[in-house]
């Protein structure tokens, strides 16, 4: 039977595993998540600098520790002990609390991310899932908490007392609102196939087939939207150095700057973990390895598969930063509203139709192929032909010279802006008589030219 039309196994009742842990087990898992995120952030910073260094034919950090692994830790210690400078025009209370607002939601989102199946805690007989908690609307919880972090960026830009910071904060808010819509629409197809919004149930539903293989448009839309959500290159417009110096953290230094930096890299890990959970089977081993090795999804091995998939998405972030130039702000916003969102809406309708027909008894493959072909044509029209109707930028004509001198701004009632100004004028006027007259040699030279 066709993969797209075959009834997929619905998610199991994985929520029954939660709500039974002892208090010390919950505390232990919370501390471990915090430690893993901090270590993963230090590793990702080192990994990015090494990969970008190789792309630019240089070694990258290679002095502190083996392979330079301790360079990120050294940089963190340096920022901790640096002096914190608060601008005179800043709102001190909001200025200091903004980085905290930005970083806390990035930690909270990992509370519903499944790192692995149920395991036995070493040196005890207690069994617990490698996930802090879960809920029936866990994915919506992740998106809601992640959107709170934008308040820290906007408040940080506003409270700094700098125009550059304020513009960076406003850009970031507009960017996140625009691409969060596309991201949410990309996830609707996953909900339709899994029959649940619980992260653990979505992972369980991908036991035999990953959604990234059958929901390719949703996967691609999510990949683009997650780069825009995290303000990473080529969508790092809120902190464009050539336009806004440093964007919303221009006036930040020391530990407050480190918190913004930490929030950015943890958000990278968050969207990568969500992509792993919803599209690449979560902690499940690659399907070819699962068939060859029966114990691939047992014990603590799933934690390794999960982290490997997360690092794969982190590498995509780094690769995009090292290869693509930054987009213009108008191009970026138009791409989100005029391309991603319409395509996501069309794809949701197609997925809902295919899913409904498949659950009612299947559909002939020929009709399915015809429908997919028509859908592909719509995608092509939206992506390529739609750009021709965009408004062309207008150019302002240069001011025409008069008698060798620039034309000053015309008073009210003068020619309309852009209208041609005659090159000759009445030299007997009072204005012309007060102007210096060119010599005979200058006039003859001008005539020869």
Curated annotation (Swiss-Prot):
Main location: membrane
TM stretches of this protein: 23-43, 93-113, 137-157, 176-196, 209-229, 258-280, 300-320, 332-352, 368-388
Record keywords, A-Z: Cell membrane, Membrane, NAD, Quinone, Translocase, Transmembrane, Transmembrane helix, Ubiquinone
Pfam families xref list: NADHdh (PF00146)
SS bond partners: none
Subcellular localization, as worded in the UniProt entry: Cell membrane
Biased composition (Polar residues): 427-442
Record EC number: 7.1.1.-
Its membrane topology: Multi-pass membrane protein
GO MF annotations in UniProt: NADH dehydrogenase activity; oxidoreductase activity, acting on NAD(P)H, quinone or similar compound as acceptor; quinone binding
Keyword Cell membrane attached: yes
GO terms (BP aspect): aerobic respiration
UniProt-listed NCBIfam families: PRK06076.1-2, PRK06076.1-4
Record note on quaternary structure: NDH-1 is composed of 14 different subunits. Subunits NuoA, H, J, K, L, M, N constitute the membrane sector of the complex.
Entry protein name: NADH-quinone oxidoreductase subunit H
Protein source organism: Nocardioides sp. (strain ATCC BAA-499 / JS614)
